Swiss-Prot record:
Task performed by this protein: Forms part of the ribosomal stalk, playing a central role in the interaction of the ribosome with GTP-bound translation factors.
The keyword DNA-binding is assigned to this record: no
The protein, known as: Large ribosomal subunit protein uL10
Record note on quaternary structure: Part of the ribosomal stalk of the 50S ribosomal subunit. The N-terminus interacts with L11 and the large rRNA to form the base of the stalk. The C-terminus forms an elongated spine to which L12 dimers bind in a sequential fashion forming a multimeric L10(L12)X complex.
Entry GO terms, CC: large ribosomal subunit
């Protein structure tokens, strides 16, 4: 079904708005994925704070022009599904990577983060970024280990000092 000019402008504006507020983007090819599976992906995306849309290549190229995701323009070939992470940079990459494991026909093309193009084979770089809570927990564990190590060294020094006296 052909889209009218106003419909095309609305789609470009919607995707552009999503791109402006996004932290990262992932582009994929969803050929061969059933409607039911795509519905499940969209539901999971909403829960994860990820904007997912299947858009015509010419429209998505116009929508990302002038944003950090302009570097993805060469990946817009064939059927294009684009996902923008709004809350956490790795959310879209993690979501689509997990979906690709379940769906053998689903193929991730590339991702972008802070204006840098990330090829599909390096998508783990983005998907493995810790969330704020995970990073905070890792930091606290490091502090806890450091203070415990300091206590052990202090007690050992105290013991050595008493043995020497």
């Amino acid at each position: 079904m052909a889209l009218g000019l106003e419909d095309k402008k609305a789609i470009v504006a919607e995707v552009n708005e999503a791109a402006k507020g996004a932290l990262s983007a992932v582009v994929a090819d969803s050929r061969g994925v059933t409607v039911g599976d795509m519905t499940g992906l969209r539901k999971a995306a909403r829960e994860a704070g990820v904007y997912v849309k299947v858009v015509r290549n010419t429209l998505v190229k116009r929508a990302v022009a002038g944003t950090d995701f302009e570097c993805l323009a060469d990946t817009f070939t064939g059927p294009t599904l684009i996902a923008f992470s709004n809350e956490h940079p790795g959310a879209a990459a993690r979501l689509l990577k997990d979906f690709a494991k379940e769906q053998e026909k689903f193929e991730i093309k590339a991702a972008a983060f802070e204006g840098e193009l990330i090829p599909a084979d390096n998508i783990d770089r983005l998907a493995k970024l810790p969330t704020y809570e995970e990073a905070l927990a890792q930091f606290m564990m490091t502090l806890k280990e450091a203070s415990a190590g300091k206590l052990v060294r202090t007690l050992a020094a105290l013991r050595d000092q008493k043995e020497a006296a």
